[in-house]
Amino acid sequence: ICRNHIENVQQAIPACVGYGAAPGRPAFQHSICTSVNHVVCHGIPSESKVLKNGDILNIDVTVIKDGYHGDTNMMYIVGGETSILANRLCQVAQEAMYRGMATVKDGSYLGDVGYAIQQYVESERFSVVREYCGHGIGKVFHDEPQVLHYGQKGTGMILEAGMTFTIEPMVNAGVWQTKLLGDKWTVVTKDHKLSAQYEHTILVTKTGIEVLTARPEEDLSRFM
């Protein structure tokens, strides 16, 4: 269903299909990633795994449109209600993304993004995943720079108008460490506690950013 919608309705190409083959790792064979509960990222869709009310689900979509990549993901609460902890985790992950985005403009430092995210997440008693990060994006799916979601203010690359990259903090309810499963794709929390993630692809402008993957229902007035 997802692949049909991407190809025939959006007139785009699902970038994940056939992506990422490497020695000891098969290419990804699905059009989206689906990460449930303690899965941090790159979860593989499965017809045998049944979602339950209260599960938190991340859907990650990357498409190629007119030769350029767009990468975005967000959280969904199965059944509309979940635990207080899971609900707060999802809210913090989204706000962390926004706080990282708010630091970006022509002349700002890349390290400011990670600093803003880490400071906020840890103030909420959660942790930021270190092993995976945002990335440059455009005609290439994964490109420089690496966009860390932790770090020090005033460090790293100086950003310039015209750059495009993703900000996609992965926020864990427990420790930040993760584990890669035997399928060589699925990443889970090391302590099996919940994880949540939000992602946007952004364009750096002279005064701030343009959110290239903005959703119609999303309030992005703080970036206008």
List each language-model region with its residue ranges.
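Active-site neighborhoods and metal-handling regions in enzymes and metal-associated proteins
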Residues: 1-224
